[in-house]
Design a protein with these regions (language model features):
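NAD(P)+-binding Rossmann beta1-loop-alpha1 motif at the extreme N-terminus of oxidoreductases
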Residues: 1-51, 55-58, 62
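Rossmann-like NAD(P)-binding element
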Residues: 54-85
Length: 86
């Protein structure tokens, strides 16, 4: 079902990491199918990249059009600001 699908996570906190970990543990996706970004914590992105082998990105306009699924793993208060960037 998710073969060859590319999934972007907007947000790289605990919620995103739990989903990524579960998705990879269940082998629903391969690490190269997962892309992650966040607002400002570059260290967290590097940690996720190193720990899970996922890709990271900073440019929404370049990356998101290539995605099949976009998951907002952010706090409700940050949704409006994030959607404006897209």
């Amino acid at each position: 079902m998710l073969n060859n699908k590319k999934v972007a996570f907007i947000g790289a906190g605990s919620m995103a990491e739990a989903m990524i970990s579960g998705i990879l543990a269940k082998k629903l996706l391969q690490p190269q199918q997962i892309y992650v970004t966040n607002r400002s914590n570059k260290e967290k992105l590097l940690l996720l990249q190193k720990q899970y082998g996922v890709a990271t990105f900073r440019n929404y306009q370049e990356t998101l059009p290539k995605m099949d699924i976009i998951i907002f793993a952010i706090k409700p208060k940050d949704i409006a600001e994030t959607i404006e960037k897209i």
